[in-house]
Amino acid sequence: MESAPAAPDPAASEPGSSGSEAAAGSRETPLTQDTGRKSEAPGAGRRQSYASSSRGISVTKKTHTSQIEIIPCKICGDKSSGIHYGVITCEGCKGFFRRSQQSNATYSCPRQKNCLIDRTSRNRCQHCRLQKCLAVGMSRDAVKFGRMSKKQRDSLYAEVQKHRMQQQQRDHQQQPGEAEPLTPTYNISANGLTELHDDLSTYMDGHTPEGSKADSAVSSFYLDIQPSPDQSGLDINGIKPEPICDYTPASGFFPYCSFTNGETSPTVSMAELEHLAQNISKSHLETCQYLREELQQITWQTFLQEEIENYQNKQREVMWQLCAIKITEAIQYVVEFAKRIDGFMELCQNDQIVLLKAGSLEVVFIRMCRAFDSQNNTVYFDGKYASPDVFKSLGCEDFISFVFEFGKSLCSMHLTEDEIALFSAFVLMSADRSWLQEKVKIEKLQQKIQLALQHVLQKNHREDGILTKLICKVSTLRALCGRHTEKLMAFKAIYPDIVRLHFPPLYKELFTSEFEPAMQIDG
C-alpha cells in the first residue's frame, strides 16, 4: 500500500457533474480575472448549457462565457468556465487551486509524482494536480493584473478561433441531407459497424477511438479512461510461499464452489490472498465514478415532480440515448477496473474481450448498489437521485422494476467496498462464458478471487451463508442483462438508425447482435 497519500479533497469531486464541481450561476465574463471568492454548488455541472454561438468571437465586455468555454480546462480537460487565476480552467480546478492557496497545504504524491491529471483522475492526487496548476501558470498574483493586455486578448482570440474551427470541421463531416442528430453525435465507419475486437482492444490499451469522440460541446458525456502509472498492481510472483493453505472444497474453507474442473482447485498462500484482495480493492476504489461517501451525502437530492415530468415527456429515443451514454460511461470505468486486476492482462486478448463483453454490464449493476437509496427507492442518475418514474419514457417499466428490485436486494446486504470489489472481480472472471480460449486459466483466477472474497468476508465477521447469497446473485445478474438485451433489440427494431448513428460505439459493440460474428472462433 502507498505511504501517507493525501486525503481526497471532498469539495473537489461532486458526483453527477460533467465538470464535476461547476457552480451554477457563478460565472465571470471570460476576459476578466477571477478573485476566487465565489461559492461553488455541488453537482451543478450537469445542468450547464453546452450551447455556443456560431458567430465570430468579439473580445469585448459582451463576450459570453460560452464563447470561451469552447477551450477546455488547461488542467484537466473538462469544460472550462472562464479565466481563473490567470488560466482558463473549469470550476473544479479553480476551487481546488483557491483552497490550496488559502490553506497553504502541502500535498504528497503516493506514486512517482507524474500522475495523469484529467477529468476522471484529477481528485486522486492533489500533489500532481497542484503542480500542474502551477506549471500552466495559475497564480494568486494573477488577480492583481486586471484586464488582459492586447497581446493576451489576441492570443486568446486565436485559440478560441482554432477550437471553433475544429468544431465546425467536425460538424461539417455530417452527410448532407442527414437528419439532425441527437447529441452527442459519434462518428462511425462507412458501413455503420466497427469490429469489436479492434475497437474494444483500443479501449483495452487505454485510449478512446478517435472516431468515437464526441465534439467538444458534449465531450463530457464520453470519458477518456487512461491507465495510471502504477496500474501494474502488486507482484504476486514475488510473495514467499509460506504459510501454505489448502483451500480446496474438501478443506471446508471453500464450501460453496461450483467449479467444474477439480484439477484447478487452488493451493495458495495467505499472503497471496491478502495481496490479491488488496490489489482488487485498490483497483475498484481507483475506478469508481463517485466516492461512496459523497453519494450518501446527497441522497436527499431527488428530482422534483416537474423534473420527473420533463424526463417522462422526453421522446423515447432521446431517453434511450441518454441512458446508453450513462451506461457507457460506467462501463469504461469497469474496463479500467478489469485492466488493473492482477492476472487479467495476462489473458489472451480474445478472452479479455469476451469477459468484458459478457460481464461489464453485470459489474455496472453490482456497482449500482453504491448509488442506491433503499429508503426512498431511488438511484443516482444524471445529477440527482431518481425514482423508477423518471425512466417511464423508455417504454420498459418491467425491466426498470427489475433493476430497482436488484439494486434494493444487493443494497440490503450492506457490502463493504472490499466486498463489492471482490464480488465484481469474481463476476467478471466467469470461466463459463462462451468463446473463451483459456477456460482453465480463467477458472483458476476466478477461484483465487472467490477465495479472497471468502477470506475478506470471514475477516469482516459476516454472517454464515452470505457468500452463498452473493453467488446466487450471479444468475439474477445474467437474467437482468439478458432482459436489457431483449429491450435493446426491441428498441433497435423500431429505431435502427438511432442505434446505428447515435448510440456510443462501445455500447453497440457490447450489446447489439450485429457484432456477434466478431466473437466466433474457429474450432
From Swiss-Prot:
Task: Please tell me which stretches of this chain the record labels as motif AF-2.
Answer: 506-511
Residues bearing Phosphothreonine are: T183
Q: Please provide the record's keywords in A-Z order.
A: Activator, Biological rhythms, Developmental protein, Disease variant, DNA-binding, Isopeptide bond, Metal-binding, Methylation, Nucleus, Phosphoprotein, Receptor, Transcription, Transcription regulation, Ubl conjugation, Zinc, Zinc-finger
- What start and end residues bound the annotated signal peptide? none
**GO cellular-component term (any):** nucleus
Q: Which GO terms describe its molecular function?
A: beta-catenin binding; DNA binding; DNA-binding transcription factor activity; DNA-binding transcription factor activity, RNA polymerase II-specific; ligand-modulated transcription factor activity; nuclear receptor activity; oxysterol binding; RNA polymerase II cis-regulatory region sequence-specific DNA binding
UniProt-listed PROSITE patterns: NR_LBD, NUCLEAR_REC_DBD_1, NUCLEAR_REC_DBD_2
The protein's PTM annotation reads: Phosphorylation by conventional PKCs in neurons inhibits transcriptional activity. Phosphorylated on Thr-183 by MAPK1/ERK1 in vitro.
Q: Which residues form the NR LBD domain?
A: 272-510
Q: Which Gene3D superfamilies match?
A: Erythroid Transcription Factor GATA-1, subunit A, Retinoid X Receptor
Q: What induces it?
A: In T(H) cells, induced upon antigen receptor ligation in the presence of IL6 and TGB1 (via STAT3). Oscillates diurnally in central nervous system. In liver, Isoform 1 oscillates diurnally but not isoform 4.
State which tissues express it: Expressed in cerebellum, heart, liver, lung, kidney, retina and brown and white adipose tissues. Expressed in the subset of mature Th17 cells.
Q: Which residues carry this modification: N6-methyllysine?
A: K38
- Record-linked SMART domains: HOLI, ZnF_C4
DNA-binding region boundaries = 73-138
The annotated region (Disordered) lies at 1-63, 154-183
Cross-link annotation Glycyl lysine isopeptide (Lys-Gly) (interchain with G-Cter in SUMO), location: K240
One Gene Ontology biological process: xenobiotic metabolic process
Which SUPFAM superfamilies does this chain map to?
Answer: Glucocorticoid receptor-like (DNA-binding domain) (SSF57716), Nuclear receptor ligand-binding domain (SSF48508)
The main place the protein resides is nucleus
According to the record's subunit comment, the protein's assembly and interactions are:
Monomer. Interacts (via the DNA-binding domain) with HIF1A; the interaction enhances HIF1A transcription under hypoxia through increasing protein stability. Interacts with CEBPB; the interaction disrupts the interaction CEBPB:EP300. Interacts with the coactivators NCOA2, PPARGC1A (via LXXLL motif), EP300 and MED1. Interacts with the corepressor NCOR1. Interacts with MAGED1 and CTNNB1. Interacts with CRY1 and PER2. Interacts (via AF-2 motif) with PROX1. Interacts with NRIP1. Isoform 4 interacts (via AF-2 motif) with isoform 1 of FOXP3 (via LXXLL motif).
Job description of the protein: Nuclear receptor that binds DNA as a monomer to ROR response elements (RORE) containing a single core motif half-site 5'-AGGTCA-3' preceded by a short A-T-rich sequence. Key regulator of embryonic development, cellular differentiation, immunity, circadian rhythm as well as lipid, steroid, xenobiotics and glucose metabolism. Considered to have intrinsic transcriptional activity, have some natural ligands like oxysterols that act as agonists (25-hydroxycholesterol) or inverse agonists (7-oxygenated sterols), enhancing or repressing the transcriptional activity, respectively.
Name the protein family. Answer: Belongs to the nuclear hormone receptor family. NR1 subfamily.
Q: Can you name this protein?
A: Nuclear receptor ROR-alpha
The organism named in the record is: Mus musculus (Mouse)
Encoded by which gene? Answer: Rora
